[in-house]
Regions:
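Active-site residues of response regulator receiver
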Residues: 54, 81
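Charged docking surfaces used in two-component/phosphorelay signaling
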Residues: 17-25
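The feature encodes the CheY-like receiver
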Residues: 16, 58, 85
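Short hydrophobic/Thr-rich beta-strand motif most characteristic of the beta2 strand and flanking loop
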Residues: 27-34, 42
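Acidic catalytic/metal-coordinating carboxylates
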Residues: 35-38, 61-64, 69, 88
Length: 88
């Protein structure tokens, strides 16, 4: 599975480290970045097969990152957030 690359975009180092450890233990190649601008740039350079994307990010929020990625790719994006309600 090392051919499968996952990009984790999350500003909480505890969450990004946990996801990285979990997916690397399952055999995936994982890259982590901590803000929306880095997320878009890393997507273009790293060319991941899957993106795990936090909603609340510094510099550029998860919705904007998702829109920018969607302009260039249809790769799967899973939104990861601590928000508990739709209206949050």
């Amino acid at each position: 599975m090392m051919d499968t690359k996952i990009l984790v975009v999350d500003d909480d180092p505890n969450i990004s480290d946990l996801l990285k450890i979990y997916f690397e233990n399952e055999g995936y190649d994982v890259k982590t970045v901590a803000d929306g601008v880095e997320g878009v740039n890393a997507f273009k350079q790293y060319e991941p097969d899957l993106v795990l994307l936090d909603l609340m990010l510094p510099k550029k929020d998860g919705w904007q990152v998702c829109r920018e990625i969607r302009e260039i790719s249809a790769k799967p994006i899973i939104m990861v957030t601590a928000k508990g309600e739709v209206f949050d």
